[in-house]
Structures are given as C-alpha cells and as structure tokens.
Amino acid sequence: MGVWLKNGMSFNKDGELMRTHIKIEHGTIAAILYEQPLEANEEDVIDVGGRLIVPGLIDLHVHLREPGGEAKETIETGTLAAAKGGFTTVAAMPNTNPAPDRKEQMEWLQARIRETARVNVLPYAAITIGQKGEELTDFAALKEAGAFAFTDDGVGVQSAGMMFEAMKQAAALDMAIVAHCEDDTLTNGGAVHDGEFARRYGLRGIPSVCEAVHIARDVLLAEAAGCHYHVCHISTKESVRVVRDAKRAGIRVTAEVTPHHLLLCDEDIPGLDANYKMNPPLRSREDRDALIEGLLDGTIDFIATDHAPHTAAEKAKGIEAAPFGIVGLETAFPLLYTHFVKTGVFTLKQLVDWLTIKPAQCFGLKAGRLAVGAPADIAVIDLETEEAIDPETFASKGKNTPFAGWVCQGWPVMTFVGGTLVWEKGRA
C-alpha cells in the first residue's frame, strides 16, 4: 500500500521549491507529485503541514565512541541524535578502543551497527594499526569487511612515505583516504588557535600553518598516487587556497567544513570555556570568512559536523586539559539555516545540497536525493518555529556545545530511514 507524505515543500529537479506529495513504499520513494492534488485513503497519509521535505541529511564525520568510549556516546545514542537532527546517514570515525584496524574488528562493528543503529552508519577503517602511524592496516581485508574509507582521524599521518603507500593502496581498491591534517612538529602543544585569544590568556596556540602544510604535502602525494583524497574539517584561509589550487590542477581532492568553523572564530570564545575547544580550533575572523567563500565557490564540497561527544567531567577540566571536540548532530541544520539562510548568505537550496547530495556525490553514495527509486531516507523540517538550543534535551550523551541558548529556526520534526519513521518530535 505505502504511505504518502502530504502537503510538504521540496525542491524539484530544477531547484524550484514546490508543494509536494511523496509516496513511500517498500523502503523507497515510489512517487512524487508536484503542485497536484492528492487522492489517497486518509489512513495512508501523513500530512506534514507545509513543512520542508528534504533528502535525509548526510554527515560524513561523526564520532560514535563505541567501542571503548561508551561513557561519552554509543552507536545507539549517537544515531538517535543523528535522527533527531534530520541525519539518515553518518560515517563513524575509527578513533575508538580498539580501532577498526583489522577485519575481525570491522566485522564486530558492522554487527553492532545492525543491532543498535537508528540510521545508516558507514564505518571508517583506520589507515594505520591503532592509529599510531607505524604500520598500515590490511586495506583489502577491511574493504571486504565493509569499510567505507580509510582515515586516522584525530591524528595526522606524519610520515609522507606511509601516507603515499596508503594512497597507492587505496587507489588500487577505488577507496578514499580521509585526512585529519596536522603536522605534529608545528602544533606547539596548543589548545586554541595561535591568535589574539591565546595571547590574551597566555595559552599555547596551534598555528594555521600546521594544517595547511600537511594538506599541501598530501595533495601532491594524492596526485602522484591517483587517489581520492578528502580533507577533514578545513579551518584556515591557507588551507582553502591549497585545496583551491589543487582542484584547479585537476587533483582529485575534496574537502569538508564544520558548522562551528563557519559560525565562530576565536574572538567569540567567552573566557576559558572548554566547550569552545575543538581540533582544529576556532580560527581568526579572516579564516572564517575564507571558509564561507570557499564553500560558496565550490572549493569546499560539503558540510560535516565532526560530532565529538565528551562527558561533563572531562570538559570541566578547563580549556587546556579538557579533550578537544563538541557535539553537532542535533544543532547543525537549525544553526546554519538561522544564521546563513535567514540572513541571505546561503540559499536554502545550497544548504540542503551541502548536507545531502554533495557529500553523496563526493563518495558515490545512493542517498542524498528525492527521486523515484531512491532510498526513502527523508527528513521533514519546520522552518518557522523558534526554539532555544538546550543541551539537556539532547539525545546524545554529550552535552558539550558552545551554542547553548542560541535561538534557532529550522528544526527537524520527522526522520525516515528506508521508509521507516525512526524519530518524530514529541514522541518518545
């Protein structure tokens, strides 16, 4: 029989926002009607009341912490947070304990995902054993076990020779290398950006060059290896310039940016609050402006949250001792919609694309589009209601956000994965 989502608004193939009815059947989108009346039995209809219907959002950079970090997050709680944020596909980073660095561990992780995940989870495999940068993992075995791509996110692969070999192996398997870009000899042991905030409080700063020089090295290695190379959480104007030049040279490089690096700079940190501590750190206003420009001109391909939950006790240690990272799955769309679409910096279509079809295209995913035959991974979003961000209402175990109290519009109200309603606002 199927179910109709009635009276929504969505973008057609020409990018026009139109009144829409969508039929879900057998886990896929069976029909789409634009600007037409709907004749269907009442029991087979969900009236979404004029709200926005978009492809389920895609986040290719999240930390679900399981195994080993279950006090911070689990696959179940993290994917419930994803569903609450309108995300139907997330890619899980491998900095867990143990890391998915061998076939058996990847198989365990896949089984755990099947048992507990609320949304689609794409597991990354580690580039090196234990993410220690000393010995490459067995790429072929990990791909066979279901690895999505390879990364040592959380640390940069310091050896150029090891990264080059990793890229050659990944290219032979038609897999991507996804990189946290940071030259450890240049990080200075810092906790924040090497800028005015660091100087004001006498803190050691992380210079911009430690990221940009790593990207510059890697894009040349990727060119030589013929590998798809993806830059995680780009944060500096120099990095944007390197990626832009690499793309112009025809190198197969893609890049992501986080909501927090688009929204904040180090000038916005209110004292020594560890909820503003992440890696890469909040950079200068010039850097933030370059990130926005890079996203708009296509240098940066899409947005990813780098959702990184920690316990309250960990974040209470202070800005120097606390771990890096903030949560982002439940706040990404409302923050970006309110502060960029409502202000005219981005169009609604651009924002939706950067969170759906753009990451899907970069990594060859079937998700990210509303089309007949596509997976029925769908989010319904209320663009009108204003609500303040309240960490105590988060589904994530992590409450570590710098955005508490920010008033936003653009809140997801329903999320479907494979045609199944996995989260609805107001329902337990």
Curated annotation (Swiss-Prot):
Its EC number is 3.5.2.3. SUPFAM superfamilies: Composite domain of metallo-dependent hydrolases, Metallo-dependent hydrolases. Gene3D superfamilies: Metal-dependent hydrolases, Urease, subunit C, domain 1. HAMAP family: PyrC_classI_B (MF_00220_B). It comes from the Bacteria. It comes from Geobacillus kaustophilus (strain HTA426). It catalyses: (S)-dihydroorotate + H2O = N-carbamoyl-L-aspartate + H(+). Zn(2+) 1 binds at residues 61, 63, 153, 306. One of its GO terms (cellular component) is cytoplasm. It holds the Pfam family DHOase. Catalyzes the reversible cyclization of carbamoyl aspartate to dihydroorotate. This is Dihydroorotase. The active site is at residue 306. The keyword Hydrolase applies. Keywords: Hydrolase, Metal-binding, Pyrimidine biosynthesis, Zinc. Substrate binds at residues 63-65, 95, 279, 310, 324-325. Its cofactor is Zn(2+). The gene is pyrC. Belongs to the metallo-dependent hydrolases superfamily. DHOase family. Class I DHOase subfamily. Binds 2 Zn(2+) ions per subunit. GO terms for biological process: 'de novo' UMP biosynthetic process; purine nucleobase catabolic process.
